[in-house]
Amino acid sequence: MKKQSQKNRPARGAKNTDRAAVILSLFREFPNNKFSLKHLASASGGATKEGRRETFEILGRLHDEGIVEECAREKYRLTHKHLPHFEGIADMTASGSIYVRVEGEENDIFVNQRNTANALNGDRVEVVAIHRGRDGKFEGEITRIVERSRKPYVGVAEVGAHQIFVRADSRRMPMDIYLSKKQYPDVKDGEKVVVRIADWAEGSKSPVGELVERLGMAGNNDTEMHAILAEYELPYRFDPEIEQAAEAIDGSITAKEIAARRDFRQVTTFTVDPADAKDFDDALSVRRVRDGVWEIGVHIADVTHYVRPQSTIDDEAVERGTSVYLVDRTVPMLPERLSNELCSLRPHETSLCFSAVFTLNENLDILEEWFGRTVIYSDRRFTYAEAQEVIETGRGDYAEEILTLNRLAQALRRQRFKNGAISFDREEVKFKLDETGKPLGVYFKEQKESNQMIEEFMLLANRRVAEFCGTRKTDKGRTVERPMVYRVHDSPSEEKLDRFRQFILRFGHIFKATKGRAIAKELNKLFAQIKGTTEENAVATMAVRSMAKAYYTTDNIGHYGLAFPYYTHFTSPIRRYPDMMVHRLLARYLADGKAADKAMLEDLCFRASEREVIAAEAERASIKYKMVEFMKEHIGEEFEGHISGLTEWGIYVELDETHIEGMSFLRDIDGDFFQFDEANYQIIGRSTGRRMTLGDAVRIRVKRADLQKRQLDFEVLLDGLRTPAPAEGQGPQVRRSNRRKNR
């Protein structure tokens, strides 16, 4: 651009200044656009000759100041340094591209692999917006790595003659990581290791790592389970000082302690748990008060009697947040001395509890309720199967008590659903393992009345404790809130609900509800309709994904899924830290103590919610690993399944018998060239016109089982399709969709 000298430029008037502001705002609103002089003059209200002259002068000043540059003849754009800049966290995909999560921005910023500047997953980066799409979303270029993530990577070492490369398990690390063989001479080929990124110099093909830990040879069950824990930065042992602190706890129950508690040792009390349970943190007692009136005690292990606030053990429990349940093991929140011994409500032993006691009639009216510390004696340990047998036959130990509890529990359950609770009955996958941890079979744990019996009384205790702690009556009779730890669940967003509505429409189901309890009512109706159908699992899974996530907070919004205005977690303090927090709050408020520090509670709630999510991800990873390990023995075999998902590159199929899911790449399907018709959400064969969509029954062959990536590849067999091809002479009707890159 030919510059004008400053002395020949006219003075800036108010009108000129306004036009300059409009022009600058245009550049900033559309940072990737190239604007002509004519366009800018017209857009700023200066289509006349005089207006174009003023626009040219403004562009001259912006050019001199380094804000815009001439990129073609009389075409202008923002200079790189004046493009919108953001700082955020890099979220890497399997392809090597990155999405940058920026606080306060609705959408992530997409960064193509060629513009990532060696950034890695979890890095804090500076990104400049170089393009803005029609949907308003930015595409960016990473200009600086503000801070490298210290998150470790787990992978398999490939040892060469002069170097070691670690192939990471995580799909978020698509590059191999270099280790110095000279620095780490003992690392073996095929060994599972934990590494951190130390450096990634510009121009280098691979990041340089530092060895954190050697886990053992890949494929060994203990190694692989420890690898999952390491991937999610979860501990698998306690430090010696914590074990020593646990061993030092005095477990004796003195006469003085018993005298300070309500004594339930003469009241029939028992536990009901899974057959493989080692810690028993809840028990039920039942006593007939008079005809049609029962006293039900919900007795919870008094963990906070043994674990003092801010002690070594308490600090570790805060750090862990929750117990973690992998397929073949439990990683406890508390040391075994507490979780399996002192706090566990074992049969034929006296135990200390924190209890919620209710006097109920057959109409479920709560005639009395009492909260406080107790001492109990567990008369019997039932498994769920044993309690279920009593329910079904009417015979067995404590049959009258169990039948009474079950009758009341089923009535509570009916009342809950009548009030708008959602019936999410999901199957829980289990594995039959040999002594080495190898999966021999897959089965599903069914929720029966014995499970529901325990669940309903735990829900009753949780909601009543939440309301008692969260509110109090003033001297003038007003109800006021006080700081409390809640387990809350919001109603689904309109956007997620609309996606769910469109999803189930493909199966012929219509969902009209848009807000309030009508959503829950219609969901329950839908679940009843799809029971036993091919689409049941796909629809139920999508329904769960459409819901908001439950979390811990001090700001009560109620629990939408359970239809409770007040709800908390009180009943599992051995395995959840928020329950320990609630026990301490209950003790405080029973003693008329002053209100707790809400800000401190909120910080602990936030951390507990984070730890819960991480634990759930690790649990799912262990299930996926065992599913792939199980199917590795069935390579080449054929199975029946149903289509559970579609993408432009493949078909997800869930096997009917085991509910194991894998993907069949479209390119792997022999006999035709298949394309994804996004508009109609189906796959169509170009030659045959065969169509495949969600819920279709298919036959597959197991092609590959990648244990390291926990990934299954299937091959859909065309002769196993149960959807007919078009009649002869009827050509395939292929709707060509705009194929998008996998972002």
Language-model-detected regions and their locations in the chain:
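A general secondary-structure junction signal
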Residues: A72, H80, L433-E435, V488-D490, ...
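Charge-lined substrate channels and their catalytic hotspots, especially those that engage the 3′ end
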Residues: M1-G297, T304-T350, F382, Y681-I684, ...
